[in-house]
């Protein structure tokens, strides 16, 4: 285990963040780092970033859905090998489609059904250009609830034979997972998360449907045009794009705070336990942090575990082997470093420089890693 040089950590992060603020690369941001059970860094940047500020998580919702699914796997109510049509017979007619002139054209039927494992590892056939078209064309009724959305995606199709390719699914795969969880538990997905993850982890501000008071704490969306900061586009009353708050989008729909998500990350670092409350078994967290996509399908320095990416090669450079975590379209980012007992969380909401390849996320990783001693 290598400890962080706290003085160096503060220097790295303060210099970087001030530079990004001055260049209008970020408008507001909140950072929190922990090592070996102790806070090592915590700071808010920008005029609106305060204790309790609420951020749109976007795809940093996915690890929460991953934990929810794996809790049911532990309870033997769900298996990674379960095909989707076990829960949704509609999927037995799902087509493989391609995009032609912004239309989806059927080109065949899959030989095998997508499974829970495929949904968690972005190998189900959902995603990419096909899902982009599906998202643009989804009708208001299909977009209104998670169950309606699952039926829509079952009819709209997948882009390839499951587990023959890797294609990031922004919403569809994890919407299907959330729908499956609702059917297994006979509970609304938001209620299941509250009772089984949020309440035990002390995540009191994590929600699909913010209250009026939480909306008042919501960080404004930022953008950057011609080197100048400007307001970013949002849809009134929606946490993620045009998804209504009645649709508990398992891939992108949650809002949360720095404090709440840090609790979630620390739970993962602690092997599934937070404040004496057991969410998952240590071996289940380890399974989530294990690559499940072969290098032949994903010859990269990071590969998909269950709902999160895992550093699998030393030439990744910015983080040690075995670190795992994920990001969001609006610039949120986190990782867990089991070897050095670190959790690090970066919150921002911006249409400039977001997603898994955000420059600010890469800089955050570099600045923390360069502060490790030895």
Per-range role (PLM):
Residues 94-321:
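Short, surface-exposed loop or secondary-structure junction motifs
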Residues 335, 341-350:
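Short, well-ordered beta-strand elements
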Residues 11-18, 37, 56-84, 174-182, ...:
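Active-site SXXK
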Residues 351-374:
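Generic C-terminus detector
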Residues 47-49, 350-353:
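A short acidic/small-residue loop/turn micro-motif
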Residues 3-58, 77, 93-100, 105, ...:
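Short, conserved catalytic-motif segment at the N-terminal edge
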Residues 85-94:
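Acidic helix-start/capping segments at beta-turn-to-alpha-helix junctions
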